Each structure stands twice: as structure tokens, then as C-alpha cells.
């Protein structure tokens, strides 16, 4: 019996090179996975729909598949109990599984296998650029690593965007300085409509209601996210043709104007929205990177007459996210778990405000980011890092609560990728393992990269007045703070000085640009 987890929907895995009538593939919906954190309802639907379609695809290809829904697994408290039952029921002689990408599941399965009386084996998921065995060559427990150095090594090793002399294509490694543009009014008409799918998940929603699965966010019987390989490849192709030409230019931009105009494109902009398909392994990072590169090369060779032309900065910015950040945070996660999950370098201990689950706040930037997340189970990286994450950092929210919120609300959130991004990059709770500084910013940065501030109840230019940006009087009675004032509180916090003299390390993101 071979176990396939919900984030292991990899049709290219070597398991599927040959068919064996004596091998049973198990795909199962479990309360254990719906309940370890409160998930967005679209996230649960997407994983369950993806699992169902993968099971059907395997069955159609001639593999022996057992697909169990919540109706079938409700009697089992956890995965080991279900597996033990099925091993006995089907008289299984050997149990195999792909190594989970989450510490919790990897420990759980290792403990189960240690108790089994039959043979067992774990194999690679065959998804990432770096195997598990290779990670210690790039990462060490507790050591502070820098993504840029790692990214350059990855570019060199896999010969991606490198010239014949072993130098970075275009003469530089990073074009991030070119990718900080705000969407002006004249840019808005050109923002593409997002490619949306119409996957019927009404039966899954009925199951969630029947089993009283607690979720958050807006439920939709027609799921817009890709849940099979064909849809994921279609979305990738759409990205290359319609989003890639301006991906880098506007990757940090935010706008609420499109929604006000009755055209709901502001949540997707030029982003690929491939993260769910990638993190569920419906498609591979190699396929994504190679497809983007092939599209870029064809245009360079004038085999494609697409307009506007795609320049190197757009391609490099996108590949950096896949080859760089995605592989980087995975390495940080595995070389630092389980200790990483409890790090709290800034001793942050405040509770997450209740309006994080409703979006009912007068702060326009927070309202936009949270309402969008509740509606689509998605926000792009700057909304996560510099809006909601920035707020939590500056106001000292407990990183455990921040982790749980991010892990639950986003469709692409799995612990291996969420935790280093949230606890590390966003909250600096790891004391600098992921980032060299805390990514804190004032309202001026938000005003520079968005059009939120112009229609906000609060005034970005104010400091300590009642209408200052933003008020956090729920934390400190009768006081009103703006982002920069909160930042100053971090610098003055004596608790922070106990961690590598953190007060000297924290800097406002792009201070010279926004001062």
C-alpha cells in the first residue's frame, strides 16, 4: 500500500512509471488535516477536489486506487489509526509513503512505521530542486542564511539565466530595483482579467457541513483555483502570455481602484497564482521555471510576436521566487525544526485583533488585504509581508497566532513554506535566521506602493493624532500610533535588546526611499 497525501498530487512521480495490480494507492480525507488549524473553506475544497481528481486520473490510467472521503474516515481519530486498520483489512505486506513536507506528519509516519510488523519504506516526493539529503550542504541549524547568496548558488548549479562564461545573464543577479513600481491610473486598464476555473465543489461543501468542519472565509460552490494538471498548465500558459510582461514591474504594487470601478482584478494583478498548484505538487517548480524560460527565449528569438515584449527583469523576478525563495524557506524549515516553531526573538505576546477574521477595520490597507484573503484565500507577497505582516510585527502580535492565521487563511499555505515566511521574514521571530533585518515600514511605504491611503479614514501624514495611521488603541488605551511610531516602540523595547542587540539590526524597509 502506498500513501499519497493531499499535497503529493505529482503525476510525474516514479511510482507511476509502472503498474502493479498488487499495489494499492491510498488517498484519504481526514479530520486530522481539516482540524489542526482553522482553514479557509476554499483551501479545504481545493485540496479535497485535487485529491479526488488525482484519484480519478490514477484509476483511469489503470492503477488500483482507494479514495476515502470524510464519510469513510470519520471513525478514525488520526492517520496512523486509519493506516493500521487498512493494513490489516487489505492484508498489506509492505507500506510505502512519500516523505511529507511537514514535520508533524513526517514524525507521525515515522513513529507508525517503527511499530508496524510489516516492512515499510519512505521515498522522496521528487518535487523540489534540492533533495532532502542535499539540504545540509546549503543550510545549518540555527545559522543565519541569506537568500541572495543561496539563490546565486542555485542559479549556478542549475544553469538558469547564466551566460556561456558562467556569469549572470544581463550582467547582474538581481533586478529587484526595477520592480518597485506603483500602479498609476493609466496602468489600471491594462491589468489582465484573471483566468478563473469553475470546479464544482458543492458535494465537498455538503461534506464539510455534514461533518461540522470549522472553516473561515467565503465559500463558493464553483472553485476558481486549478485542481488538476491540465488546469495548472493552462494557468501557467496564461501567466506567460498575459501577466509575465509586467510581473516584475508591478509585483509589489497594490490597488483598490479596480474593485471600486466594479472590475475585480485588483486581487490578482500580474501574479501567476500558481502557488496552490505548486504546493500541492500538481505541477513542479522545474516545469514552471522551464516554461517561463522557454517563453522568454522564444520571444527573444522573435518566434513569438507578443506585445509588450518581456524583458529580463520580469523573468528574473519570477524565477527568483521559485528557484530562490521557495527552495530557501524549505531548507530553513527542515534544518531548524522543531525548535523553529517556538522561536519568539522579540518576545511578542499580544493577541491578534478579532477583525483579522472579518476585515472590519477602518484601515484601508488592512481592510483590503483581509477582505481579499477572506474572499479568495489569496493575497500576494507584499500584502502578506508589508500590510498584515507589518502590522503584526509593529504591534507585537504573538507569532504563534500570526502563524495560525496565515497557515489557515491562504490556499497555498503549508507549514514548511508558511512558517519561515511568517515567523522569520515577516515577524523576525527567528532573530535573523531568514532575514538580516525586520521588514518594518511606515504608512509612507504603503502610500508609495498603493492607492489605499487616499481613501482611508486615517491620514498617512498624521503622527500621534486621533486620525493617525493606523490607530492601535486596542493595544494601549488612549494612545494612537502610526506605523513609524510603532516601529520606534520596537527600537525602544528593552526585550528586543536581549536578542543579538536587535535594536541595531532592525531597519525600516527602504527607509531612504520613503523618508
Explain the meaning of each model-derived region:
Residues 63-77, 355-358:
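Glycine-rich phosphate-binding "P-loop"
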Residues 8-10, 74, 99-107, 393:
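Gly/Ser/Thr-rich loops at beta-strand to alpha-helix junctions
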Residues 1-70:
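N-terminal beta-strand-loop-alpha-helix module at the start
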Residues 1-15, 41, 169-299, 309-311, ...:
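Substrate/cofactor-recognition hotspot
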Amino acid at each position: 500500500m502506498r500513501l499519497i497525501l493531499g499535497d503529493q498530487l505529482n503525476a510525474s512521480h516514479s511510482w507511476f512509471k509502472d503498474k502493479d495490480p498488487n499495489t494499492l494507492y491510498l488517498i484519504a480525507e481526514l479530520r486530522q488535516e481539516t482540524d489542526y488549524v482553522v482553514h479557509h473553506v476554499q483551501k479545504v475544497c481545493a485540496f479535497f477536489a485535487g485529491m479526488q481528481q488525482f484519484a480519478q486520473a490514477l484509476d483511469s490510467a489503470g492503477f488500483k486506487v482507494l479514495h476515502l472521503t470524510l464519510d469513510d474516515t470519520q471513525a478514525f481519530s488520526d492517520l496512523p489509526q486509519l493506516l493500521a486498520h487498512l493494513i490489516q483489512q487489505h492484508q498489506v505486506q509492505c507500506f510505502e509513503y512519500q516523505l511529507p513536507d511537514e514535520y508533524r506528519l513526517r514524525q507521525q509516519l515515522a513513529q507508525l512505521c517503527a511499530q508496524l510488523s510489516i516492512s515499510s519504506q519512505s521515498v522522496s516526493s521528487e518535487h523540489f530542486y534540492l533533495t532532502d539529503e542535499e539540504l545540509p550542504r546549503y543550510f545549518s541549524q540555527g545559522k543565519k542564511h541569506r537568500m541572495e547568496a543561496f539563490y546565486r548558488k542555485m542559479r549556478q548549479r542549475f544553469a538558469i539565466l547564466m551566460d556561456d562564461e558562467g556569469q549572470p545573464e544581463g550582467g547582474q543577479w538581481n533586478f529587484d530595483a526595477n520592480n518597485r513600481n506603483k500602479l498609476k491610473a493609466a496602468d489600471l486598464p491594462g491589468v489582465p482579467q484573471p483566468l478563473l476555473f469553475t470546479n464544482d465543489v458543492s458535494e465537498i461543501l455538503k461534506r464539510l457541513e455534514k461533518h461540522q468542519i470549522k472553516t473561515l472565509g467565503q465559500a463558493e460552490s464553483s472553485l476558481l483555483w486549478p485542481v488538476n494538471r491540465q488546469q495548472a498548465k493552462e494557468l501557467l500558459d496564461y501567466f506567460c502570455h498575459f501577466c509575465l510582461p509586467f510581473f516584475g514591474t508591478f509585483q509589489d504594487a497594490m490597488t483598490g481602484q479596480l474593485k471600486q470601478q466594479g472590475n475585480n482584478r485588483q486581487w490578482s494583478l500580474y501574479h501567476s497564482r500558481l502557488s496552490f498548484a505548486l504546493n500541492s505538487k500538481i505541477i513542479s517548480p522545474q516545469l514552471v521555471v522551464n516554461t517561463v524560460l522557454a517563453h522568454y527565449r522564444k520571444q527573444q528569438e522573435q518566434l513569438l510576436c507578443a506585445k509588450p515584449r518581456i524583458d529580463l527583469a520580469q523573468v528574473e523576478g519570477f524565477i527568483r521566487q521559485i528557484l530562490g525563495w521557495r527552495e530557501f524557506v524549505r531548507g530553513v524549515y527542515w534544518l531548524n525544526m522543531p525548535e523553529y516553531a517556538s522561536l519568539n526573538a522579540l518576545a511578542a505576546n499580544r493577541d491578534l485583533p478579532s477583525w483579522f477574521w472579518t476585515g472590519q477595520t477602518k484601515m484601508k490597507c488592512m481592510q483590503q488585504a483581509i477582505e481579499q484573503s477572506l474572499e479568495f484565500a489569496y493575497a500576494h507577497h507584499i500584502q502578506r509581508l508589508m500590510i498584515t505582516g507589518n502590522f503584526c510585527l509593529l504591534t507585537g502580535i504573538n507569532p504563534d497566532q500570526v502563524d495560525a492565521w496565515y497557515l489557515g487563511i491562504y490556499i497555498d499555505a503549508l507549514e514548511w513554506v508558511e512558517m519561515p515566511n511568517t515567523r522569520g521574514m515577516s515577524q523576525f521571530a527567528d532573530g535573523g535566521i531568514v532575514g538580516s533585518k525586520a521588514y518594518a515600514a511606515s504608512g509612507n511605504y504603503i502610500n508609495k506602493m498603493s492607492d489605499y491611503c487616499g481613501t482611508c479614514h486615517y491620514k498617512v501624514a498624521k503622527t500621534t493624532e486621533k486620525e493617525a495611521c493606523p490607530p492601535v488603541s486596542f493595544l494601549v488605551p488612549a494612545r494612537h500610533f502610526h506605523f513609524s511610531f510603532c516601529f520606534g516602540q520596537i527600537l525602544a523595547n528593552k526585550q528586543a535588546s536581549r536578542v543579538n542587540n536587535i535594536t541595531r539590526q532592525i531597519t525600516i524597509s527602504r527607509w531612504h526611499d520613503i523618508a
